[in-house]
Amino acid sequence: MILGIDTSNYTTSVALVDDDGKILKDCRQVLPVKKGHRGLRQSEALFEHIRNLPELMHTVIGDQPIKNALKAIGVSVAPRPIRDSYMPVFRAGTGIAEILSDAIRVPYYRLSHQEGHIRAAMCETEIFSWQHQLDANWQRQSEPMLAVHFSGGTSEILYVKREKKGFQCKIVGRSLDLHAGQLVDRIGVMLGMDFPAGQALERLANPLQTAPLKLATQVVDGDFHFSGMENAAKQSLQKGEEPANLAYALFEAVGRTLGRAIIALLEKTEVSAVLFSGGVMANEIVKEEARKRIFAFCRSHRRPVSLCFAKPQYATDNAIGCALLAKEAFEAEQKKACND
């Protein structure tokens, strides 16, 4: 068995997978945010993780004979797989992993939250293809792809290649101001919803098939802006726009922005697959608008491509990706040791 731990800005997550990669346990606890507030300070989030971890760890491994069965631990130690990437919240999970690793003498692998998102998104995907067929083992292939990570703390498009441990990630598109999840939560809180507001805002928008309101988007060479949408949304509300119209227009604009950014990057790269992860990518309106726009480009340019959308349970923050990456890194080390 392999244990995964992730302590992100807003969710404490612990997962356990078996030697075949089957998910045995997946436990998560969303951190509480006071009504009317738009987030947590790092110190507040760190405290909540420290409070949540003992109970989640007991739920995941309390009845498991881990002393002889646990082979490795994977833990997110930073937001991104780049030098100097750091947030205090990840110290909570890292500390638990280090203690457990020393106590039962198993290796632990230092991973990033972003890599965990990418790997978890590969677990189960909804794949839409235009004249392109993904190999059955595409999750393990080394061919580069684009990976979208849209959440409350990140809005990036990455050029990704598999490595022996985790992924090599290069940012090729990103928000130059607000993150997509920040935008959604700010508008939701403005409408009186609890933080995080994504699901409640989507429920408000879902009954609409079209909306009379359209928010402008700004995309340049794969980079984009969301702050203008926030200002436009505030102005619309002040003018008496219906909240349901605004909710739909907001998600439609995020999807349109993402679609335009992906198209700009497809024009500059040779990739044939795009993976979508992060909590915002669980939104059906965002997914549909991005897919529709990208496929229109593919048809007109005869560009084969597959769009792989993570199922909602794998799109949001979790520790499954860390567990699976640790499993694969452990297996690679074992194979190398046998060959040597």
Language model features by range: what are they?
Residues 7-8, 24-26, 139-143, 149-151, ...:
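A short helix-loop
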Residues 8-47, 166-171:
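Short glycine-rich, Thr/Ser-proximal phosphate-binding strand/loop in the N-terminal lobe
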Residues 61-98, 102:
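Short beta-strand-loop/turn "lid" adjacent to the catalytic site in phosphate-handling enzymes
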Residues 67-78, 270-281, 308:
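Short glycine-rich phosphate-binding loop at a beta-alpha junction
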Residues 106, 110-145, 325:
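Conserved phosphate-binding catalytic cores of ATP/NTP-utilizing and phosphoryl-transfer enzymes
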Residues 117-120, 308-340:
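Glycine-rich phosphate-binding/hydrolytic loop that grips phosphoryl groups
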Residues 203-274, 280-297, 327-336:
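A contiguous, well-structured pocket-lining segment that forms one wall/lid of small-molecule binding clefts
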Residues 274, 290-322:
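Conserved phosphate-binding/catalytic loops in two-lobed NTP-binding clefts
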